């Protein structure tokens, strides 16, 4: 094991120790280095980097906790098993994102949107964008590895093609969910704007009704002589009756105007 570590370049060892290192395949004379970065969804989205050293005789997995290379059972099957296990878990756990987006879509159709809609939308957008970014790089690296070893008779081509297809499948799913999120965002904005327009329209109607009333009240509030209805016992009743008639007339006019607009649309 120590002999293998002596073969590995110092810079490559630093890459293996880097928990945030992106996926990469680097071929060398004495060994090849493969780093595969994959998303992991447990309670929240995380990402881990698996580092492998592949020699002519075997393969080794870098154990970050123990800071050393550990021998795998076979040259190609060992890395395949580690990567394939994480991909299977990712495929299953990714369904939770799809379910959340479907639920959000249903709430929009049923007009039962929760108050935390945008917070949930931003969280999903951030996580799925991160998954798409990671899987795009990982898929390309796996393709590079397949091309490099395709002439090696001991290389299990079908196994690694299967890994590449899983990467592409997750990538396509992430892209599809992102397009759905964009659609939901536009739909949500449309519904919100409609509600805002209705509110503004209602405020306009209220203003149209009460503005003439305010003018009339202000007129009769002037402390000047010669105001109408100041003489006689039924002056107040006459003013109230006039105000009621004005409200009814204005409301009827606004209603007819609104019906005309709706009919033209």
Predicted regions and their residues:
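Peripheral, non-transmembrane regulatory/ligand-interaction domains of membrane transport proteins
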Residues: 1-153, 162, 166-169, 173, ...
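Long amphipathic alpha-helical coiled-coil segments
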Residues: 146-157, 184-193
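Leucine-rich repeat
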Residues: 154, 158, 176-179
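Hydrophobic alpha-helical transmembrane segments and their immediately adjacent juxtamembrane loops
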Residues: 168-169, 175-265
């Amino acid at each position: 094991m120590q002999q293998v570590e002596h073969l590995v370049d110092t810079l490559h060892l630093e890459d293996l120790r880097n928990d945030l290192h992106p996926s990469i395949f680097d071929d060398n004379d004495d060994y090849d280095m493969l780093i595969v970065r994959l998303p992991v969804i447990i309670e929240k989205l995380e990402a881990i980097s698996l580092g492998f050293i592949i020699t002519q005789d075997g393969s080794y997995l870098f154990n970050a906790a123990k800071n050393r290379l550990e021998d795998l059972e076979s040259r190609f099957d060992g890395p395949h098993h580690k990567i394939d296990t994480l991909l299977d878990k990712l495929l299953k756990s990714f369904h939770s994102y799809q379910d959340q987006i479907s639920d959000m879509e249903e709430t929009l159709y049923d007009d039962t949107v929760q108050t935390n809609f945008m917070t949930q939308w931003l969280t999903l957008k951030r996580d799925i964008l991160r998954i798409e970014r990671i899987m795009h790089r990982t898929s390309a690296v796996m393709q590079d590895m397949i091309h490099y070893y395709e002439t090696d008779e001991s290389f299990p081509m079908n196994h690694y093609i299967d890994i590449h297809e899983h990467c592409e499948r997750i990538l396509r799913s992430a892209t599809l969910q992102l397009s759905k999120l964009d659609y939901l965002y536009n739909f949500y904005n449309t519904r919100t704007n409609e509600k805002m327009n209705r509110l503004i329209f209602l405020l306009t109607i209220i203003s149209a009704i009460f503005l003439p009333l305010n003018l009339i009240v202000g007129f009769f509030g002037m402390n000047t002589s010669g105001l109408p209805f100041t003489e006689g016992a039924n002056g107040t009743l006459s003013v109230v009756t006039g105000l009621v008639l004005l409200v009814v007339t204005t409301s009827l006019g606004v209603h007819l105007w609104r019906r005309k607009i709706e009919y033209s649309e």
